[in-house]
């Protein structure tokens, strides 16, 4: 019995199936490619909005803001980690919350939210760059154009055919080009999965694809 036979037997005993794992990986790359293509336009819009939030920065939360906000609500004071339920006077409740560090807590919360926004923005940029790198490096100019018409401009096959010289493009060709474009993105994702620096993004993308099912 040679080493290959022994290794194969060990893999089977351990319940491992390299071929099945490979097939599962290929399915994920195909599903992820379609997900990225279909959400490409929305991702571009989201990037603009998140960039604006990040550029605006965190506005410091002041004591004046706290007094205004706390005065505007009639319930919920006792949700902070300070006992105020036994204080019936609203100004006294507000003073107790301020003394307990309410403003500082709010500033920490705002900074945490901005940090989360920055992480979301970085991940979003990576997804967009994945699509656009695949377009630049793995698609012809015509394929790029058809890809944008399908997924970005949401054109129908008939509209795409009409945009080209009559008789030069048919539905079957568009369908074939669409498959080639999606394969280009899948291939780029497969290549990116080899780099540990992208493992967290890959995990996030896998979860997003699962949620879409």
Question: Model segments located where?
Answer:
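N-terminal interaction/assembly modules
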Residues: 1-134, 190-213
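Alpha-helical hairpin
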Residues: 138-139
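The N-cap/first-turn positions of alpha helices
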Residues: 142-143
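A short pre-motif secondary-structure segment
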Residues: 146-147
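Short, locally clustered residues in the helix-turn-helix/winged-helix DNA-binding domain
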Residues: 151-152, 186
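Helix-turn-helix DNA-binding module
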Residues: 153-173
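DNA major-groove recognition helices of helix-turn-helix
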Residues: 174-192
């Amino acid at each position: 019995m040679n080493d290959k036979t022994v290794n194969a037997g060990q893999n089977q005993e351990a319940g491992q199936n390299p071929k099945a794992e490979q097939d599962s990986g290929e399915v994920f790359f195909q599903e992820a490619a379609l997900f990225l293509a279909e959400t490409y336009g929305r991702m571009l819009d989201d990037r603009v909005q998140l960039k604006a939030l990040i550029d605006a920065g965190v506005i410091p939360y002041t004591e004046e803001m706290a007094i205004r906000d706390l005065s505007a609500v009639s319930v919920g004071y006792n949700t902070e980690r300070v006992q105020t339920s036994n204080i019936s006077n609203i100004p006294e409740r507000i003073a107790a919350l301020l003394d307990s560090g309410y403003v500082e807590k709010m500033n920490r919360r705002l900074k945490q939210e901005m940090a989360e926004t920055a992480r979301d923005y970085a991940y979003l940029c990576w997804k967009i760059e994945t699509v656009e790198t695949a377009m630049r490096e793995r698609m012809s100019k015509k394929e790029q154009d058809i890809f944008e018409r399908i997924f970005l401009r949401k054109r129908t096959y008939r509209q795409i055919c009409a945009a080209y010289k009559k008789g030069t493009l048919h539905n079957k060709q568009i369908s074939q080009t669409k498959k080639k474009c999606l394969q280009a993105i899948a291939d780029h994702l497969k290549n990116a999965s080899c780099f540990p620096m992208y493992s967290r993004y890959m995990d996030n993308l896998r979860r997003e694809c699962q949620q879409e099912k």
